[in-house]
Amino acid sequence: EKPLDSKIKFSDYLSQWMEIIKPTLALTTYASYSNMVRRAIIPYFKARSIALVDLKATDIQFFYLDQLKRVSGSTVIHYHAVIHKALKYAVKIDLISTNPADKVERPKKDPFIGSFYDSHEMERLFAAAKGTHLEIPIFLGAFYGLRRSEAVGLRWSAIDFENNTLTIR
């Protein structure tokens, strides 16, 4: 890999930054960042071949506008957080003097509209999930009101078999 310098392409910098921060992040956080960087952020900026030193707030803003055609505002907010953090590190190690993401309008979060399954839909969901790797997370989510991220983020250490409790973090 190329050494980190300001002439590095932003897309290449992101790949190297991911390796640098990997030891400092929880596994689930790293997986989330990695997914966003690999699937959306790198492909967009790689196609535009923008050097880190030449990255402008408008480049980032146009990325957000492009992504809002594909994903929710909430997802683009997550992209913003990752890009901002990556560029903050670039400033810290003197690759760039300012963080262009500071000058970008953060996308608005989509309003949450809750929905729920009725008893027949729940029965169909349980039947469809039976015997799959999703059976337990779906069961826990349904009976304990867990969010998707809470259900998939559960660890054995969260279960206290002596006191029959489950700790959600």
Where are these regions (language model features)?
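Short, intrinsically disordered, charge-balanced linker/junction segments flanking boundaries
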Residues: 1-5, 161-169
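Basic, Lys/Arg- and aromatic-enriched nucleic-acid-binding interface segment
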Residues: 73, 77-79, 92-98, 102-154, ...
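N-terminal helical hairpins
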Residues: 1-7, 19, 23-24
